[in-house]
Design a protein with these regions (language model features):
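Secretory targeting and sorting signals
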Residues: 1-39
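N-terminal carbohydrate-binding accessory modules
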Residues: 14-16, 35-98, 343
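Post-signal peptide N-terminal regions of Sec-secreted extracellular proteins
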Residues: 40-42, 125, 352
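Short amphipathic alpha-helices and their capping/turn segments at secondary-structure boundaries
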Residues: 40-42, 86-92, 119-121, 216-219, ...
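Feature marks short, surface-exposed loop/turn motifs that line or immediately flank catalytic pockets
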Residues: 55-59, 105-107, 138, 177, ...
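Extracellular glycoside hydrolase catalytic/binding regions
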Residues: 64-80, 150-157, 161-170, 174-302, ...
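Aromatic-lined substrate-binding rim segments of carbohydrate-active enzymes
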Residues: 83-138, 149-152, 193-201, 282-299
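Short acidic-hydrophobic catalytic motif
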Residues: 145
Length: 352
C-alpha cells in the first residue's frame, strides 16, 4: 500500500508501550518450541521477482481481506481455480515467480481461511514463492501497530502450522510498522522469531522500520540475522527528483544490506500513459521507475511491484479481463512491465 513516511515517527499509543515492556517476557504460543532454524548463506535476493495481489481496500480491513477478483462466497475449490488463473497470468504477462498476499486475524481466525488458503495453495502449486504479510485494520487501528495481540498470535500460529513445511511460503510479521520506534520494531520482530524458532530464518521477511522505508536499522540488529529484509519505496514520496537523486535516495535506504533486502513494494502510475522506456528528466515518476529498476538490478535485489493487481488502482500493472469466474489479466502499461523485467535481469536498459 502507498503511504508517505513521516519525517518524525508518531508516538505509539499505550498498548505499544505495554508491548515494549512485555518483550522481556517469554511469548506464549500454541506452536511447540524447537531448536532455532538456521538460514543458508545467500549472495543476493534476485530469485524474488513478483507482484502484490491486493484487496481493493488497500489491504486495510476490519473484516477478511478479499483480493481483487475473489469473493468471500467462493469455496476453496472456486478460490483455487480463480487464483490459479490469476497466478498463471502474472507469469504469462510479466514473467513473475513471486506473489505477496495480505492476511489479518479476520481472514485467518474465521471461516474464510478455508477458502483463502486456496490462493496460497494455487500459487505454491505453480512454483510461485508466496510472501504472506500481516496488515492492520482501519480507523483508529491504522496506526502502524499490531492491532490486538490476542488475535495476532493465534493468526500466526494457524498460518505457521499450515505452511511451515512448505518451502515456497515466506512470512512477514507486519507490513509497515510505522507506529513503533526503530528499537521497538526490532524488539517486536525478535519476539516473533523467538515465538517460532522452528521457522527457518530465510523464510522470514522483517519489514524495514517506519513505512518499511529503510532497512538499515533492522539490518544492524544481530537478533534478526539470517532473515530477509523488506523495503518499500514510492515515487510520490518526493514531488520531484532527478534520476541520479532517486538512485542516491534508494541506495541510502538500503545501506550495505542489499544482499538481504527485497523491495516488496514499489510503484508508480501505470494507467496514465507514461512511457517508462524513454528518459524524461521532467517527469518525477519516469525518473523514479527507471532509477528504482536500475538500482535493484545493479544491487542484485529481488523486487515485488505494488500492485500487480488491485481493482481501480492507477498503479496496478494488471487489470482483470474476461469472465469473472474464469479471470485473466491484461497489462496496463507495457513500458512499466519492461522496466520490471529489466529489474529482474531481462530485457533492455533505457538509453540515456
Amino acid at each position: 500500500m502507498r503511504n508517505t513516511p513521516a519525517i518524525s515517527r508518531p508516538t505509539p499509543r499505550l498498548r505499544a508501550t505495554l508491548l515494549a515492556l512485555a518483550l522481556a517476557a517469554t511469548a506464549g504460543t500454541t506452536v511447540a518450541a524447537a531448536a532455532p532454524a538456521h538460514a543458508a548463506p545467500r549472495q543476493d535476493t534476485t530469485p524474488f521477482q513478483g507482484v502484490n495481489w491486493a484487496d481493493p481496500r488497500d489491504n486495510y480491513a476490519d473484516d477478511p481481506v478479499v483480493l481483487s477478483g475473489l469473493s468471500t462466497s467462493d469455496s476453496y475449490a472456486r478460490t483455487y481455480a480463480k487464483a490459479s488463473r490469476v497466478i498463471a497470468a502474472f507469469r504469462a504477462n510479466l514473467g513473475a515467480n513471486t506473489v505477496r498476499l495480505p492476511i489479518n486475524p479476520y481472514t485467518v481466525n474465521g471461516a474464510y481461511w478455508k477458502s483463502y488458503r486456496g490462493v496460497i495453495d494455487a500459487a505454491s502449486a505453480q512454483g510461485f514463492k508466496v510472501i504472506v504479510s500481516y496488515w492492520e485494520g482501519t480507523g483508529a487501528n491504522k496506526d502502524g501497530l499490531i492491532d490486538d495481540e490476542a488475535t495476532y498470535w493465534p493468526m500466526w500460529d494457524t498460518v505457521i502450522k499450515a505452511y511451515q513445511h512448505n518451502k515456497r511460503v515466506y512470512f512477514e510479521p507486519m507490513n509497515e510498522p510505522h507506529g513503533y520506534t526503530e528499537t521497538e520494531w526490532a524488539d517486536t520482530a525478535a519476539k516473533w522469531l523467538a515465538a517460532y524458532p522452528s521457522v527457518p530464518r530465510d523464510r522470514v521477511f522483517v519489514s524495514g522500520a517506519g513505512y518499511n522505508d529503510h532497512v538499515t536499522s533492522v539490518c544492524a540488529d544481530p537478533r534478526l540475522k539470517g532473515t530477509y529484509l523488506s523495503l518499500h519505496d514510492y515515487g510520490f514520496w518526493k514531488d520531484y527528483a532527478t534520476y541520479d537523486e532517486w538512485v542516491a535516495d534508494i541506495k541510502g535506504r538500503i545501506g550495505d544490506c542489499a544482499s538481504r533486502t527485497v523491495a516488496d513494494e514499489f510503484g508508480a502510475p501505470m494507467t496514465t500513459g507514461l512511457d517508462y522506456n524513454k528518459p524524461d528528466a521532467s517527469d518525477n515518476f519516469v525518473n523514479y521507475i527507471q532509477a528504482a529498476t536500475d538500482t535493484f538490478r545493479e544491487l542484485k535485489m529481488g523486487s515485488v511491484y505494488w500492485p500487480g493487481l488491485r481493482t481501480d488502482d492507477t498503479y496496478s500493472l494488471q487489470t482483470l479481463t474476461g469472465d469473472p469466474d474464469r479471470p485473466w489479466l491484461a497489462t496496463t502499461n507495457q513500458s512499466g512491465a519492461d522496466r520490471l523485467a529489466w529489474a529482474w535481469g531481462r530485457g533492455r536498459p533505457v538509453t540515456r
